A protein has these predicted regions:
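Solvent-exposed, non-transmembrane regions of membrane-associated and secreted proteins
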Residues: 1-184
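C-terminal single-pass membrane-anchor helix
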Residues: 173-209
């Protein structure tokens, strides 16, 4: 049995052995940087890389695939789980995940495939509650997870989608940029060169006098 079948099969195993972790980290890692694919959520303007695992270093800049859940390749009897932070000062990530509604869509782009999911269930659960992220027989599911309420983080927000046919998304661009910088941070960076230029102009005029 291949590692794709062993990890995230009908017998979901949330705790992997060292051997399984090593194999897991090598799957869908074509470029060798740990990126499995990309997720896009058009309604909240999210476009982020999906990394292996949910180490803090990953969640500071992107979203992570929860090891032990189904791999982000789709298929019957699969349930992929993607986790992301919210409320970071330098990256929006899943900050606006609570704005999603049933009927919204999100896409995962893995290798040369696009997997499209339609939101059909939104729940708030205790952190230890795994009952909503298990495999449902015959279904192709993906759940997006983040902490809630905003700033308190005592519970988990689960936004689940079921696989649908791909839609025409030719006008939507997917990027590898994990960071959406806050305007408060960007403004001083943009303003500094302008202020410096104005200062130089004023100094030149002053000297001419």
């Amino acid at each position: 049995m291949s590692i794709i079948k062993k990890i995230g099969s009908e017998d979901q195993n949330w705790v992997l052995t060292d051997e399984q972790k090593e194999e897991y980290n090598s799957i869908l890692n074509i470029s060798g940087n740990g990126i499995m694919g990309y997720i896009e959520i058009p309604s909240i303007k999210v476009s982020l890389p999906i990394y292996h695992g949910i180490d803090e270093a990953v969640l500071q800049i992107a979203v992570g695939h929860i090891e032990g859940s189904s791999l982000p390749v789709g298929g019957e009897n699969s349930h992929c789980v993607i986790s992301g932070h919210r409320g970071l000062p330098s990256a929006k990530l899943f900050t606006n995940l609570d704005q999603l509604k049933e009927g919204d869509i999100f896409m995962m782009r893995v290798l040369d495939e696009t997997l499209t999911y339609e939101v059909d269930q939104i729940r708030i659960v205790e952190p230890e509650d795994l009952s909503n992220i298990g495999i449902v027989e015959g279904e192709d599911l993906c759940t997006l997870v983040t902490c809630t309420p905003y700033g308190v983080n005592s519970h988990r927000l689960l936004v689940r989608g079921h696989r649908i046919e791909n839609i025409d998304a030719s006008s939507i661009r997917v990027t590898a940029d994990a960071l959406q910088i806050d305007p408060v941070i960007v403004a001083p960076v943009v303003a500094a060169p302008i202020l410096l230029l104005l200062l130089i102009v004023l100094l030149v005029r002053y000297r001419k006098r």
